Each structure stands twice: as C-alpha cells, then as structure tokens.
Amino acid sequence: MIANGTGIAPFLGMLDFKDTEKHLYCGFRHQTEATNNFTNIARNQINTSLKIGYSRSEMPKYVMDLVNEDELIFVDILQNNGVIMICGSLRMQKDIETTLSKICEKNKLNSIDFYKKEGKILTDCY
C-alpha cells in the first residue's frame, strides 16, 4: 500500500487483516499529531511494516524514495502474485509509477502496464 496525504485513509481499515502480510508506505509534508496517530495504528498491527517520509522535514524524503529503498520487496510482491495499491495525489501516482517502471525494467519483470491490466497495481488518485 502506497499513499500520501489523505490517501492513507482507505488503507487504515485494511490494516486489520491479520492473515495477510502488509507493507504501508506513506508520505506527508510534516510530522503532526495525525501522522503520529497513523503511525501508532500501523505499528500495532500484526504482519504490517510501515515506512513514512516527510517531504518538508530537514531531511526530506518522498514516498518514491521509500519505494526505491525497498526495491526487492516490490519485486517480490510482483513476482508472487501480490497487489500494489496506490492512493493519493496524481503527482505522487506518476512518480510512483515511474519508480515501479524502473524497478520492473531493472529486475527484468513485466511492464507496469501488464501489472495494471492484471489488477496487480491498483490506483485511486485525485
């Protein structure tokens, strides 16, 4: 699951599924009480990993940076019939799709369009 800003909302309910391994990557401008609440919710779930980037912090980090850092997790997801869900801004979606395309090419996977057609990369962006 990849989100920025309010795009995290749909994923919060999905965190309750205990039987499925989940990876949540999210980006916000600043660390706030709300982002701390999201962090606490995610960290208290079983089978859930969490990575957060803050784009306006002293050491800015964007969601695409987090995805790049965990390239092999995304390769594993795509190779093993997993699903990548993206929710948030259209700009973030474009950046993430570019990042995933590079990961697919580098690791000799199918194209991102293939995974989208197969329902393995899902987007709900605005």
What label would you give each PLM region?
Residues 1-18:
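Active-site beta-strand/loop microenvironment that shapes enzyme catalytic pockets
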Residues 20-126:
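Reductase modules of NAD(P)H-dependent flavoproteins
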